[in-house]
Amino acid sequence: MPKILEFDESARRALERGVNRLADAVKVTLGPKGRNVVIDKKWGAPTITNDGVTVAREVELEDPYENLGAQLVKEVATKTNDAAGDGTTTATVLAQALVNEGLRSVAAGASPILLKRGIDAAAQAVSETLLSRAREIDERGDIAYVATNSAQDKQIGELIAEAFDKVGKDGVITVEESQTFGMDLEFTEGLQFDKGYISPYFVTDPDRQEAVLEDALILIHQGKISNLAELLPLLEKIVQTKKPLLIIAEDVEGDALGALVLNKMRGTLSVAAVKAPGFGERRKAMLQDIAILTGGQVIAEEVGLTLENAELDVLGKARRITVTKDTTTIVDGAGDQSEVNDRINQIRKEIEATDSDWDREKLQERLAKLAGGVCVLRVGAATEVELKERKHRLEDAISATRAAVEEGIIAGGGSALVHAAKTLEGDLGRTGDEATGVAIVRRALVAPARWIANNAGAEGNVVVSRIAELEPGHGYNAATGEYGDLVAQGIIDPVKVTRSAVQNAASIAGMLLTTEALVVEKPEEEENAEGGHGHSH
């Protein structure tokens, strides 16, 4: 495939145009008065959203050079979303401001390498400042504020606070679609571990990239499964039950994996396979936890059980299993509650007996998984479009709340960044182009606050100047149009979200400024559309 190349200033300008086009579409969603974006879908109803990362993911530009710029910013949004579950729009706005300011300096003759060094140092300093100003949260009211802020919906905030109340900060909260209107919360005994599906062919919901198994059987195997002949007798019995199957094993490979994928593709058997969590002795213990919770048995040579002679009664059962690329959640296992309680007490005794901090931490994780349970938030709406949008907001709000519990909170509304910019006023003692890099970050940090104000119909630059005069923790409440103590008013952001946004934006901006050449595939020549028929005029 032939390539085309672009160099120097024109390459960077093309990237900048792509960054601007994507960021302009995303930043209209920022703040309590952010607008919606309607996204056309090839199939089904269009999506209406005010979630930055959803907008970013949909953008593909026609010009290949501009598209590279857009993809880089998309990376900022996605990385921030992965790390903190929110803050994608803030990260995009920051990246755009850094790129625009930075390219201006490069065009004026500054060294991109030194600029990048200054930008990185400034991002690190801002990140540390934000952390030092963070306030820990444990109050239910604070949790409700964070969730309300993320979802822009008080009802969602209250529900999530209640969910965290029930499962604690280590517990699992999942979101399911409901047939009724409104939202409700259900607490079920369940367990989640950090292993996802072995093959993406097991996915049942392509939109969300998940495998969902309802009323499923669970095969728990301590070793590897690679030989199809060993697995076949049990598989045939399972197919007759017409129930979906989850396989948890050290690994599933070779013939066995091929046969499972083939059966899944043909619709003979709804199946998903995941690797067992943990290592060594801990893996054995966790498999035993899963077996007790689901009423199954671990198939292992040491207890005289092999795959060939296994019957259906060694399989566990659960009402619902959700497998993503990274996690597996088992809800409502069919295990005997008294046995589960015995297991929980046994783990508690082990925690008291151990003198290793690492062991204690891992045992507490197992305890939280067994005793904590799973909170299921059910969400319903009048239309499919509204349902997707509400579900998305709920998931974002849960991630943001987790981030807040982890690292604490700071004032929201972009004001924490305006105040953090003051730590960069002496250019961190840098000189020359490095000092310019620090100054670029200082100027870019006010962009989120400016856009929150602009979207609310206020004059952004005036609002930013006013915020800078206030003490840290105070700022502009875009919902009411007033200035005041934002933390007291419940306008707060998780510090992890804001830090991730700054660091990811700085990382991409630094890479973009130091770009000197672009290589893209040459577009194929369009065939003559008339194909030789008819007359040309």
From Swiss-Prot:
It is found in: Cytoplasm. Disulfide bonds: none annotated. GO terms for biological process: protein refolding. GO terms for cellular component: cytoplasm. It catalyses: ATP + H2O + a folded polypeptide = ADP + phosphate + an unfolded polypeptide. Its EC number is 5.6.1.7. Keywords: ATP-binding, Chaperone, Cytoplasm, Isomerase, Nucleotide-binding. PROSITE patterns: CHAPERONINS_CPN60. One of its GO terms (molecular function) is isomerase activity. ATP binds at T29, L30, G31, P32, D86, G87, T88, T89, T90, G413, N477, A478, A479, D493. The keyword Ribosomal protein does not apply. SUPFAM superfamilies: GroEL apical domain-like, GroEL equatorial domain-like, GroEL-intermediate domain like. Forms a cylinder of 14 subunits composed of two heptameric rings stacked back-to-back. Interacts with the co-chaperonin GroES. Together with its co-chaperonin GroES, plays an essential role in assisting protein folding. The GroEL-GroES system forms a nano-cage that allows encapsulation of the non-native substrate proteins and provides a physical environment optimized to promote and accelerate protein folding. Belongs to the chaperonin (HSP60) family. This is Chaperonin GroEL 2.
